Regions:
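Membrane-embedded transmembrane alpha-helical bundles that form the catalytic cores
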Residues: 1-269
Length: 269
C-alpha cells in the first residue's frame, strides 16, 4: 500500500493514512478558523477550495499554507498564467537547490549517520558526537530540500509559497530557533492555539502553561508516540527556562542602572 501513497501507523492496527494528512488537515483547519474569524470570505467554488487544500507541490512536506496567502492566488489564477521568464528561472533554480540538499547532502549524510546509530556500541564519544551533528544536518537538508522543491515547483507555475526555514542553525537561542525552523507550523500553532489560549496576555504562569500545551501538541503532530510528546515538552521547558533567564537578566540590568544612577546622584550632591 505504501506504493500508492498510504501508510499504516502500526502493523497490528489496520488503519490507513494518506500521505500528507498532517499538512492538509492543518491547512483546512486554518481556512475554517480564518473564515470563522472574518479574515477571509468562504470560498464558494468547491474546485478552488479543493485545490487550496490539496495543492500538490506542498502536499507531502509543506509548507502549511495560509488561506490568506495561497487562496487569493488560486482565485486570481488567470493573472499568473502569463509567462514570466524570471519567475520560471528562479523557480527551477530553487528546485535544483532543493534536489541538491535532499539527494547530495541529506541522503549521503544519512548513510554515515545510520551506520553509526545502528552500530553505536562500536564507536566512541567523538564518533557519536559527530554523528549527532551530522544528523542535524541531515534533518535540515532533508526537510528543507523538500520544501524548496515545493516552493520552486509552485513558483514555476506562478504561485508563491511561504519560506519555511530561515537559517535555523544560526539561531542564538531556542526561542529564536523556533522562529526560524518550520516557520509555517510554528506560526500556525501561535495564531490558532497559543494566542486563543491567551498567549502571554494573562500572566506569566498562564503563558508558560500555554507554551507547554502548544509544544505538547506540536510533539504529537510530529509523531503519534510518547517519544515525540516528551520531545515537544522538552522544547517547551527550554523555552520557559530561556524566558526566565531573560527576565532575571533584565531585572539585574535594571537594578544595576538604578545603583549607578544613585551613585552618580550622591556624587553630584
Amino acid at each position: 500500500m505504501t506504493r500508492i501513497g498510504f501508510h499504516t501507523i502500526d502493523r497490528n492496527i489496520d488503519l490507513l493514512l494518506p500521505v500528507g494528512i498532517s499538512f492538509y488537515t492543518f491547512q483546512a483547519l486554518g481556512y475554517t478558523f480564518d473564515v470563522y474569524g472574518g479574515k477571509i470570505k468562504a470560498e464558494k467554488n468547491i474546485f478552488k477550495y479543493a485545490l487550496y487544500v490539496s495543492f500538490f507541490p506542498q502536499l507531502v512536506a509543506g509548507p502549511i499554507e495560509r488561506s490568506t496567502n495561497l487562496l487569493p492566488q488560486i482565485q486570481n489564477v488567470d493573472k499568473i498564467r502569463v509567462w514570466n521568464y524570471e519567475r520560471v528561472r528562479n523557480g527551477l533554480l530553487l528546485m535544483a537547490w532543493g534536489f541538491f540538499q535532499k539527494l547530495f547532502i541529506a541522503d549521503r549524510v544519512s548513510l554515515l549517520v545510520n551506520n553509526v546509530i545502528n552500530n553505536y556500541s562500536k564507536y566512541g564519544f567523538v564518533e557519536l558526537s559527530l554523528a549527532s551533528v551530522l544528523f542535524a544536518v541531515q534533518i535540515y537538508c532533508d526537510f528543507g530540500g523538500y520544501t524548496n522543491i515545493a516552493r520552486g515547483a509552485a513558483k514555476v507555475m506562478g504561485f508563491e509559497l511561504m519560506n519555511n526555514f530561515a537559517q535555523p542553525y544560526l539561531a542564538t537561542n531556542i526561542k529564536d530557533f523556533w522562529r526560524r525552523w518550520h516557520i509555517s507550523l510554528t506560526s500556525w500553532f501561535t495564531d490558532y492555539i497559543y494566542i486563543p489560549l491567551g498567549g502571554n496576555r494573562k500572566g506569566v504562569l498562564r503563558k508558560y502553561l500555554n507554551t507547554l500545551i502548544v509544544f505538547g501538541i506540536s510533539g504529537f503532530w510530529h509523531g503519534a508516540s510518547w517519544n515525540y510528546v516528551v520531545w515537544g515538552m522538552l522544547h517547551a521547558f527550554f523555552q520557559i527556562i530561556g524566558d526566565l533567564k531573560s527576565r532575571c537578566y533584565a531585572k539585574i540590568v535594571k537594578n544595576k542602572k538604578r545603583v549607578t544612577f544613585s551613585t552618580r546622584l550622591r556624587k553630584i550632591i
